Amino acid sequence: MLTSHLDTLSLLSSLPGNLLWKVKPVAAEDYFGKTRFQASISNFFINTLLIRRKGEKDSEHDPIRKMLEAIDAGYSLILFPEGTRGKSEQMGKIKSGIARILSLRPEVKYIPVFMTGMGRSLPKGKMILLPYKASVYYGIPTLVKSTDTHEILDQITGDFEVMKEKYQVVIDEEEE
């Protein structure tokens, strides 16, 4: 569930420091790389892989190609399968990009991650952190069971639904 820019920072801060140099959060070039300076800052501080959301297929700007090249170079990617920030604490529809990548690299495991409280802690359009409890829950590293993109999307969606059910109990208890 992607609800704020805090998501990426929370994920990165939960990883061991010695792994950070091999992790690339995938980010929209039109937002995080509007200028060369902005792109440099994004790359320097969080090692982003900037992609064009509307990249031309079979070109140097093809987002799938850029992500596959990073995986082939040994990087782990942080992908937000919804593709954009959604409504706070609500899961949006998973887009096909992650399924296309995994269909081409079925030997690569994915780890579903479920987050809560991020949208309240840093609401969309705001610059000030608010003092709310936020949590990050990691799923199990998983291989896809098929190379069919529709089946992969169903598998990933199912993983998120299971995590949502499992951790919704925790969320409800925390709010009481």
Pin down the residues of each PLM region.
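Catalytic core of membrane glycerolipid acyltransferases/transacylases, capturing the structured
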Residues: 1-55
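Non-catalytic C-terminal accessory region of glycerolipid acyltransferases
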Residues: 60-176
